[in-house]
């Protein structure tokens, strides 16, 4: 007789604080996992970028070269390069191993809110308060961007990249998706200034957070509103949102010191995770495991599921 398929385990949410990193770089403006989730980057108001092993709590390298606070960073797919952007209007390409600045791209007229590599890490995309997205060729010596996307009518707060698409959120209340294969631009009007936008892991949906304390799940192709998620507070700051590693939950920072988890399908609040007494400025979700990083003030907290047991020396 055939045995029944085992039921998939219900998703576990990261709610056990495993580590707190005192980052020593002023206020942490953003925290980001690298591509495989083994390391993380922290962006500091003291102009530095730091690379950590978050589970062990060890600092691996400090990157100095920005002239003002660092606001966002990303790692390349092969872990050899980093990019960052900040209040000095510059986009910086770093060599991970040496800690050296490889290139510094200038051209934005205001602070750089968000940076991403394309999948091959040959191009850096940067979104700025100057209402533009600029595409910089990592291999060229030319100082100007290879392309500028200037459809936004106000600052660009968020840029994400999939294999042939760019997703951008703007303070003008629109989320724009550039299909590079088709050469088309799709735009959806949310109405409230957008603070963060991202693709679902399966690539079917986009998640958008805005300053009306609401997250919206949209069908990527049609723009249809699939769900709304409320209960957190986001009225003043650029806060991160994302989906959990299996697309089961919507996750958002909040200005009241918590991280909120909602069931993606039901829309019901699943967990309000108390982080501290300030604004949870940034978060990052592990690509394959129930592991969350949160940034508040000058520290980063690493969270795992309740059943998690740290390996030797990692707890």
From Swiss-Prot:
| Keywords recorded for this protein, A-Z | Cytoplasm, Lysosome, mRNA processing, mRNA splicing, Nucleus, Repeat, Spliceosome, WD repeat
What's this protein's name? WD repeat domain-containing protein 83
Looking up CDD domains in the UniProt record yields:
WD40
What are the disulphide bonds in this sequence? none
What InterPro entries does the entry give? G-protein_beta_WD-40_rep (IPR020472), WD40/YVTN_repeat-like_dom_sf (IPR015943), WD40_repeat_CS (IPR019775), WD40_repeat_dom_sf (IPR036322), WD40_rpt (IPR001680), WD_repeat_MORG1 (IPR051980)
PROSITE patterns assigned to the protein according to its UniProt record, in alphabetical order: WD_REPEATS_1, WD_REPEATS_2, WD_REPEATS_REGION
Listed SMART domains:
WD40
Q: Which SUPFAM superfamilies match?
A: WD40 repeat-like
Task: Return the WD repeat spans.
Answer: 23-62, 65-104, 107-146, 151-188, 190-228, 231-272, 275-313
Q: Which domain of life is it from?
A: Eukaryota
How does it associate, per the subunit comment?
Answer: Interacts with EGLN3/PHD3. Interacts with ERK signaling proteins MAP2K1/MEK1, MAP2K2/MEK2, LAMTOR3, ARAF/Raf-1, MAPK1/ERK2 and MAPK3/ERK1. Identified in the spliceosome C complex. Interacts with PARD6B and CRB3. Interacts strongly with GTP-bound RRAGA but not with inactive GDP-bound. Interacts with p62/SQSTM1.
